[in-house]
Amino acid sequence: MDLSVIKAASLDLESLPSQPTVSSFQQLRETFIQSKSEDWYLKNGLFFRYYSFLKSSLENATLDGPSQVACLDTISVWLRRIFNACKQDPEISKYVWDTMELKFWTNLFSLPANKISIPGLTGVQVAVKDVFSKSLQLYLLVCPSEDIKNDFLLDSLKHALHWDRHAKVVCTAIQLLVKVTGAEAVFAFQPDFFEQSLKLLKDYSYAQAISSTILTVLTLRFKSLSEETEDREEVETKWMNIWCPIILYEFYGNDRQVQAGMSSFLIPSLLGVSPGITVKFLSRLQNYPNVSKDARDAACLYALKIAKDSKIIKNLDLVKEHAFVKTLFKHPDIKIQLACFRLIALCPNVSSPLSFEDFDCLESNIEFSFNVLDPDSRQILLKSMQDFFIRLRASCHSIARTMRSRHSDKVALSGLLDRAMQFLTSFISVCKKHLYPTCNYQQVLVSLSFLDTLISFGLDDNVESSSIREAQHDFPFSMVIIDRDLSRLMIDRLKDPYDDIRNLCLKILLSYKSLPGFISDSDAYFLFNHGLELLNAVRSHECDGGAKTIYLCNHFMEKSVPGSVLANTKVILNRLKSNIEHAKTSLLEAAVNCPLQGYLIQLTYIFQSLSPTIVKNDNESWKNIVMELIKASETIWGLIKDVLCDDSPEGNLPDGEGEGGIVSNLEDTPAQLILSYSWRSLKETSSLLTVLLTKCLSLFDEEFTPFTLNYYGELMMTWLWEIRHRGAFTSVYPCFIEYCSFLFECNKHEISELPDPWLHKNLSVIQEKSSFITRRSGGIPLSITAILVAGKDKREQLIEQTVISLISIAKQPVEQKNIAGQFDLPQVHAMNTLKTIFTEHRLSSVSVEYLEPAIALSIEGFSHELWPIRNCSVMLFTALINRAFGSKKPKDAVNLGNNKGLSTKMFFSKFPTLHDYLLRELEVSVASLSSNDQPSTGLYPILNMFSRLQYAQPYGNENEWTGLSQFEPLIFKCTASRICKVREIASLSLTCLLDCSKMTTFIVSQLKGVAGLQQNEIHGKLLTIRAVLSCFFSKLTLQQVQEFYEVVPLAFINCFLEFTSSKTSFYAKKLFLEVLNSYFMSNTDSNAKRLQQLRRMTMDYCKRMLLDRKANVTNVFNTIGLPIHQQMAATIFLENLKEFSVYCDAHSIGFLVSKLLHYEFYEVQLTTLRSIVDSPRKKIIVNNPEILQALIKLTPRNQWSQVRALALSLLSDSLNSTSYRLLGISCSDMVSNILSNECLPIKESFIVLLGSCIKQLKTENFLEYKVTFAKWVEILLSYSNEYQPFSSRKAALDSIIHFDLFNAESTAEAFSFEFYILYLLLGDFLNDDDEEIRSLAANHAYQVLGTSAQCVTEIWNLWKLRTKATFGGQHDFQHCINKRLILEDGCELASVQLDNALSRNCSLFERERQNLYYSDNQKLEDLLFYASYPNEKLKDWATDGINAILSRFEDVSRDGPLGKTSDPNVWFTIYKIIRIAEHVHLPLDRVHSLMNRIDGHPSFCQ
């Protein structure tokens, strides 16, 4: 653009429009930039000529958003040029001061409050910040009077402190002003500045800006204090008194968001202001009153981390000053343990070396990392360990470099390097220990993840360079990470039940140049044969393990013996063909003895990784194999087709398969075996076929013509069309997507065009009469969706023609002959396909364009005469709503005011045609509703959509959007409908029509004129009020909340009598009470007089309705809804009973509660019981005589089970000698109830109660106590094992807790019989699979132990010591331990247990352990800790076991990896025999010699 033209146009004021635009502002800004300096010195220069224009533009409220930003940018340049001119010429300064009015200065300084954001624009705050800073610079320069300057700036600061600081520009403005006015002014204007600012840290996105503002003020205050006195200690103390008490309060509080904001930004900066601050802060943390030692230590740990991350503290002193850190590894919270590890192991300076104390602490506590159960914490742990290895490598490299220096202390530095190597060696051995069979999932996963990370650091020379992460430096030493034993453990884990463990093991082993420990060809072939055996397994994870083993062998064998992959593939192919032949004879026999899935998985692995180099070496052989496999896929399909295509494949048994001797020996049903065999075979066949077709086209292009590719594509579609088993056709779906993607991306035109006609063929299939609509159209929708997903470049075109065709099919009228209940409706197939298309996330960006016609289609389908079409319309509508509005919402969820939701304006701008359509449909539905009280079924989806929308909030100068003005009266009519469901959903729909700021006015208007309304109208108004409050109440500002409680309670008081009159239905009354309870009864502000009056009126009403029988109507018709009304009244009455007890006349609280427990409606009884259960004063309440009597009366069999169960469990908290006699149920009766066929909650309540009763029985009837105690222990044993449900195990634990081991332990008779079992059971609960049960058990255990709260692992160690010290010498205790040690599934002999473990189980599923927290070998070691020596019982058992091992493995030539001794069941049996033999000092030389000879598991060899 010609600059002279710009100047000429812009300098002419007449050329500037009255309503400036972006272009005019840009021209003017360019003029200011290009102008000469002398143009600004003249009194009639650029400053004066454009002052009025810019002043009016700044005040112009009609400018659009972009023009406002352009105006600010222009003013910024204008201010900068004036500032430069004023610096050069004082006369100009005076002229500027005289010219610029106070109002203009005020507008400039108010910009951060008035221009925080402009909808649809970015960079607004940057522009405002620029203008504000330049305005402040200019004002400080031109203002002639210090008094005027100070007054104006102080006034500006006063206003700025009340601005919304959830904007960075506001924070910047305050900082700029404070630097001029001083920090004292801040505290003078806002004494609670620091407290208010801390609350703002809750929003993490603004925490940095707010922290910077706080720091600016406090730093200035520190400087002013330093000027007052030279005593640094006094200055630091005074300064810390300003902020430290509030920081400490929040530090120990519960607001995690504020704590996160403080820790990340504020505290590090505060601690860095002065060197002595950190020490003082830690001292104040440790001496903070009224918190536990654990909490103080955890807070100090947090502060140390902040200081270390900020480099305020470089090294920890774990011996003296920071010794408490080591104890925090035993903290109950795993997050604290993890933070402790990170504090020691990590450092901002990665080359900073660890001390000997650091290594010792980490090494002694590293076990904690293998017990991290929470997935999120485990991810943090793995990332922390990776960072630790980075630091370790960098520090070792730094040490080695320093050692080369002439003046370095080589001995000390060499010692540090040796200690690092020792630590890594110890760490690897710990990881190895947690890979043994029976170790739990998280231990194995963490161990493998650690090893996978460690090998990527280049420590092991045998690791491939491609597996080593890039780094600037390496470890100065090398070491073997994966040795033969670890390699063996990982190979054994290749058949682990968990996919991620199998994959991780394979990844680690493939990272090596040669398989560690297995370098000979014989080793490879031995592994290969073991893999072949696993391929024939029935269970899928074992098949996959065999396939991964052979894949591993192929990887290393091909390096040493080229052609091994081809030879191995031929072997697998021959076995596959043999198994196919068996299937032709009998599917059942094939499913049991000759499955296909393992071989198919292995072949898929082979061809996925097959390189062209290997193929070129023997092209013809590979081609023959490929063609045989492709033909085999068709043969397999022919064998299993009848099973998978049956209308009921789950129960289908082909003719003749149920006969023969094989059936009698099966652990699974024949139908289940055949079905599993069939669908898994098809799953792997489809994967293999896809790999062959996509991989081999480039290798054997002459064999894979377009005709061939088309044929097998149609074969896959046939699978999707005809298969009725969901698991089978859903497994084909991803394979078909992959195949179609391959074809679409092919460079050959004739191949890339193949999927197009398939799409038309699929649409034709939809209209065929042979396709049944059951099972949601089966795989037909997936067949179409797969093509759409695959066609990336053609996706828009394909979806357009597909969706239009499907909608057209769905709208076709149903033929009259199909109305009688036929199952071949193309309309249903079309809708189900549309649902699948809109559900597929990979099509979301394209499919959303067709939501409008699809929504209209689904709404119309709601009213269809055929149920199948109505049904799939509902499913389609749900899919469309989720696509339009995002994630699913829970049932009956109210529009909770999510600011990120879709507003009405945005929704109808995205889908404009829906506006008129929905309005037309809603008018028809409401008219139908008004005329005959029969709603059109389309009414529900329309109202449902509106309930998902948000109010269209206007921004800036925008007017309120009125696009829903025609909908509003229609929806309001629905709120008064005679149909309750319509009223409910309509009330939710109204929330999108209401501005949050107008909520109070709206509610008051709804409450006016209630008198004379019909019941449906009253109920609708209350539903509307509830919905509005649920949506908006949490979004109100403090001022709006105050206004709400000033105005709304009076409105409720005025219509209280109408809502509670006898004419009002109990449904409406219940809703009225629900609203009052949710939003008014919990507010105890004594200054709100009207609110308190409303609360008293509500309480009086609830009391009258509950306790005054005359207040309840006797007409049966008028009592509809009375039970739920009374339930809500009871809820309010009980929650506020203590506060309003003065209004309860002369009746005691116990009398009132007992009255409710005797109430005629069980709903009221349940509410009362649950209120007592949830009360922190539960024990005091239950022991009230009147309440106790009432609870006892609720225990007979004629009571409702829910009521009875709660009453029984509450009685366990009340039992003393008096209440036990009042109960009227003997302990033997309780035992009988537990052993009877009572429902489980009743049994569990009796179990809890029995623990309390036995505690009382001990003091009254010791003989009965002994008999009952034994029965109680038997019950606890049966209800506490890991296969019982959570509630039963918790009931058993609660029973022990109510028995109270702490008090019972001191009695002499406690040790005369099976008291020790309770200790063992509590130990079991300390190792339960559920964290809640472990925590409850730990709480009771540390009370008995008399220790502070620690982590469960540490509590368990202390509990073992106490149990052994107390009972270890008792014969019965040792007998019990022996029984626990040697008994397995009811079998006692070791030889029989070993035989059972060695016998192969061919069932589809193994019995899995439910306790994944406590492994078998951990349990064994703990029991051996209790076991005595000498012990003849264990000695005999171990002798039998040793003999069994020697005899069973005598003829084995080699066991090796994946062998019998690696099987978890076999391994544990042998391990248990060996460990018990070691415990009783039996010689094991022959066992070790045998295991060495047969290459048994490493843990058995010496």
UniProtKB/Swiss-Prot annotation:
Any single biological process term in GO: tRNA nucleoside ribose methylation
Disulfide partners: none
Primary location: cytoplasm
Function: Together with methyltransferase trm7, methylates the 2'-O-ribose of nucleotides at position 32 of the anticodon loop of substrate tRNAs.
Protein's UniProt name: tRNA (32-2'-O)-methyltransferase regulator trm732
Superkingdom classification of source: Eukaryota
Family designation: Belongs to the THADA family.
Taxonomy of the source species: Eukaryota, Fungi, Dikarya, Ascomycota, Taphrinomycotina
